[in-house]
Amino acid sequence: MQEIESLHQSVLLQEVLQAFAPLEEGVLIDCTLGLGGHSKAILSQKPHLKLIGIDKDKFAQEIAKERLKAFEGRYNLLSGGFAKRFKEALEMHDKEIKGVLVDLGVSSLQLDDDSRGFNFHSHALDMRMDLESDLNAQKVINSYPVVALEKIFKDYGEIKEYKKIAHKIAERRAKKPFKDAKDLSDFLSSLSKNKKIHPATLVFQAVRIEVNSELEELKEFLQCARNLKEAILCVISFHSLEDALVKNAFKDYAKNCICDPSSFKCTCSNNHALGEILTKKPITPSPEEIKNNRRSRSAKMRVFQFKP
């Protein structure tokens, strides 16, 4: 456990604590509990706050449970996708919910575990957050039709040469299926000489998003979060696709006028805002945090305060 404490660094921890500083009591939902770093820090600072922690990775949840032992009786941990579980928690607790945290990053535990297939040197081709899920990266890479690969590389990886890469993968797998993440990473490296970013980065991102339905889950969550009252919502994203969804959702929440944009005159009374955006620009890690934890460098945090 001491090893986990030293290796796992919660991204933007002080900024998250500051975002939830106004909370004194009620329920905070950590939609992506992971190893429990953010939750542990929040519970330590807020003795009257209770926690609902959600994660689809049962192994990570066991570690989080051990780390939260000192707060026995103040938390409840749920397994499953965060959009579905959040909706259930909202229906059950409603006005008790005062804070919601979503950290969309892959945990260090998952990234560093070679059996999970998230890193370029992994001797597995998996990428599942939920190990009980049927779809994994090997099925996507070795079985998806070329047109489906093109779509996920274009939509989820924003890869310019999405057609070329999809066809090259199809040609190679016809001769010899990809056996693990390292095999795929090495193959992708042979196709590109890009020095700024590892050639496999965007393909791995696209496949991981597909395997875990990450963007669909985020969309579902953001739609459900509209029903929050007098709560602080804090979302940490790690790539432009996630951040765009969060940014646009927050803008939508803050709209006073809900008339058709083509209308010449407002007829809706112009008072429909669900609250206010507390971060006009996303909060990003300090140079010091990036130096201590390179994986934090792409993090962006946005915060919204819902009205009563």
Swiss-Prot record:
Reactions performed catalytically: cytidine(1402) in 16S rRNA + S-adenosyl-L-methionine = N(4)-methylcytidine(1402) in 16S rRNA + S-adenosyl-L-homocysteine + H(+)
Alphabetized UniProt keyword annotations: Cytoplasm, Methyltransferase, rRNA processing, S-adenosyl-L-methionine, Transferase
Subcellular location: Cytoplasm
Cytoplasm is among the record's keywords: yes
Record carries keyword Metal-binding: no
UniProt enzyme class: transferase
SUPFAM superfamilies named in the record: Putative methyltransferase TM0872, insert domain, S-adenosyl-L-methionine-dependent methyltransferases
Matches recorded under InterPro entries: RsmH, SAM-dep_MeTrfase_MraW_recog, SAM-dependent_MTases_sf
GO process terms (BP): rRNA base methylation
Membrane spanning stretches: none
Source organism superkingdom: Bacteria
Entry binding sites for S-adenosyl-L-methionine: G36, G37, H38, D55, F86, D103, Q110
Signal peptide positions (record): none
E.C. code: 2.1.1.199
One protein family per Pfam: Methyltransf_5
Gene Ontology molecular functions: rRNA (cytosine-N4-)-methyltransferase activity
Gene Ontology terms: cellular component: cytoplasm
Protein family per UniProt: Belongs to the methyltransferase superfamily. RsmH family.
Entries under NCBIfam families matching the protein: 16S rRNA (cytosine(1402)-N(4))-methyltransferase RsmH
HAMAP family the UniProt entry points to: 16SrRNA_methyltr_H
Function: Specifically methylates the N4 position of cytidine in position 1402 (C1402) of 16S rRNA.
Name of the molecule in the record: Ribosomal RNA small subunit methyltransferase H
